[in-house]
Amino acid sequence: MTKFWIGTSWKMNKTLAEARLFAEALKAADAGRSPDIQRFVIPPFTAVREVKEILSGTSVKVGAQNMHWADQGAWTGEISPLMLKDCNLDIVELGHSERREHFGETNETVGLKVEAAVRHGLIPLICIGETLEDRESGRAAAVLEEEVRGALSKLSEAQKQAEILFAYEPVWAIGENGIPASADYADARQAEIIAVAQSVLARRVPCLYGGSVNPGNCEELIACPHIDGLFIGRSAWNVEGYLDILARCATKVQAN
């Protein structure tokens, strides 16, 4: 792997006008991009097509925050992989803990979605992470293994060669009141995730860290041997914040 992945999901934030302003500012700063970093942005569904169009002349990948596994049908309120491809998207975020907690997402449904994403040429960004209860009871490693294996369980041998990303987001570390994991703790968990994924896929795939990433901890995190990128929340919802973290990480990566 030659690149670090650093991107942000906006969750349920930004109007179309706000999304356009962010994308235009990111495009305007494109000349200062680092060749060592693959950037990505995941807007809400209502802005993905426009954001992708604005960033089409750059290397920034654009994604969606969820999708259904079916191509079409009676799934009121859902978005299909074909619809994402129609928007020219590159990535789809799957299995976020908020979807698992509030919308009934399971390891089974994440697996179905991962297979559908790969089948349609989308890069699945698979979110996994243990709760505080899991961590305190010593079940973190077991929970993460279950989530990794579940996410990859529907892939054929050929599909296992597709581009796949994981994002380790400990549930207790994300959100407005989240407590960032220490770099050592995150790196240890990510080593476990990478090992399990490698046992299934027979190759190493990138694993990003997400969970209260900010300008104060991004450099320490990106320097860890098993952290292949950062999945940023509110610290990157302002384009200046995103560009700041990108610049800090680029300097750190080049120094290493």
Curated annotation (Swiss-Prot):
Where in the sequence is the signal peptide annotated? none
Assigned GO CC terms = cytosol
Q: Which UniProt keywords apply?
A: Cytoplasm, Gluconeogenesis, Glycolysis, Isomerase, Pentose shunt
Entry superkingdom: Bacteria
Q: Where does substrate bind?
A: 175, 212
Q: Please list the GO biological process terms of this entry.
A: gluconeogenesis; glyceraldehyde-3-phosphate biosynthetic process; glycerol catabolic process; glycolytic process; pentose-phosphate shunt
Q: Which residues of this protein are catalytic?
A: 96, 169
Its UniProt entry gives the catalysed reaction(s) as:
L-erythrulose 1-phosphate = D-erythrulose 4-phosphate
Fetch the PROSITE patterns from UniProt: TIM_1 (PS00171), TIM_2 (PS51440)
* InterPro entries, A to Z: Aldolase_TIM, TIM_sf, Triosephosphate_isomerase, Triosephosphate_isomerase_AS
Family, according to the entry, reads as follows:
Belongs to the triosephosphate isomerase family.
Q: What's the protein called, per UniProt?
A: L-erythrulose-1-phosphate isomerase
User: What organism is the protein native to?
Assistant: Brucella abortus biovar 1 (strain 9-941)
